[in-house]
Regions:
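Helix-start/capping segments and mature chain N-termini
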Residues: 1-105, 127, 134-340
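Extended, Lys/Arg-enriched charged tracts that mediate electrostatic binding to polyanionic substrates
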Residues: 114-129
Length: 340
């Protein structure tokens, strides 16, 4: 293993030794290439640069206490990328190719997989871009699919602790019938200013309401929202929300624990009724919410009265992390051992 301070990694980019690439030309995917270059040479008129023809994914590799390295639900990442491809007219990356490239890039960079004790992980970033030149709004004819990896610490510096959020109405993450359900860079560009506003106001993250009516809960920054009340796991249903693999997994685990699961429209005022709430996603796993302030209407929805994560959120977090690290039974066959 590399001699790194694994316990003090930030959630940021660190160079590793290799990335893997595969190009799409003449209607077919080519061979997988192993590359040590961190840079891409492409045409200045590439569609990814002008018309937003790019999609990405995020998943992690975990060094486990049994010495094995596992990844979590990479078939779901492949399926979500394929959905994005259909949405913005890019060729779908076959699941077998996606999984082979994930395995290859993790094995090539295994010296960068953090120790189990550090709580850090190897973040895996698949990226698909349109590379052929195009002037005029049309899909590319050539594409590059690449995957790089980088060791990361927790997304939120405080780890599993509560964080304050603020409702931002001046900006929308995505349009009601736009690209919100796809993992494309444009959605994140749309969130940059709102995220800066939230940080400038002293909050960890921005909180979005639906773009059409500003009545219903949408997303927590770059993560899905869930709330717990009356032994029920509640999460918003909307065409503009990215389908979170973490949220999908938490819903299943909540059912396994005997909770009722509701995926539906969640009015803003219902925030006052939740006993627990959190943001969930690959990067953060679960970020419990302490409060959500509505500055415009001078309201504060205090979720955690004692400032600590709630018992059900804690149980869900520990259960999911246990499956990812191989310390809990993987009854749903979510993990894949990449290195024995």
């Amino acid at each position: 293993m590399k001699d790194l301070d694994w316990s003090n990694l930030s959630f940021g980019y660190m160079p590793t030794d290799y990335n893997v690439r595969c190009c799409y030309r003449n209607g077919a995917w080519g061979e997988i290439e192993i590359c040590s270059d961190e840079y891409i040479h492409m045409h200045m008129a590439a569609t990814c640069l002008h018309y937003g023809q790019e999609a990405f994914e995020g998943l992690k590799a975990y060094r486990c206490p049994d010495g094995k390295v596992r990844v979590f639900r990479m078939d779901e990442n492949a399926a979500r990328l394929q959905s994005t491809c259909r949405g913005i007219l890019m060729p779908e990356v076959p699941t077998a190719l996606f999984e082979e490239m994930v395995k290859k890039v993790v094995r090539l960079n295994q010296e960068y997989i953090p120790t189990y004790e550090s709580g850090a992980t190897l973040y895996i970033r698949p990226l698909l871009i349109g590379t052929s030149p195009q002037v005029g709004v049309h899909p590319a004819t050539e594409y590059m699919f690449l995957i790089f990896v980088t060791p990361v610490g927790p997304y939120f510096k405080g780890g599993f602790s509560t964080n304050p959020y603020v409702i931002i109405r001046e900006y929308d993450r995505s349009a009601p019938l736009g690209t919100g359900k796809y993992k494309v860079g444009g959605n994140y560009a749309a969130s940059l200013y709102a995220n800066k506003m939230a940080h400038d106001l002293g909050y960890d993250c921005e909180f979005y309401l639906d773009a059409k009516e500003k009545k219903y809960i949408d997303e927590c920054g770059a993560a899905n929202f869930f709330g717990i009340k009356n032994n029920t796991y509640v999460t918003p249903k909307s065409t503009s929300i990215l389908p979170s693999i973490t949220n999908k997994s938490l819903m299943q685990l909540a059912e396994d624990m005997g909770l009722k699961v509701e995926r539906r429209q969640v009015p803003e005022e219902e925030l006052a009724t939740f006993e627990e709430a959190g943001a969930c996603g690959t990067a953060a796993v679960i970020s419990p919410i302490s409060k959500i302030d509505d500055l415009e209407n001078k309201k504060s929805y205090v979720i955690s009265k004692d400032g600590k994560p709630g018992p059900i959120s804690t149980q869900l977090y520990n259960k999911l992390r246990g499956i990812q690290y191989g310390t809990e039974p993987d009854i749903h066959n979510w993990t894949t051992v990449i290195i024995e």
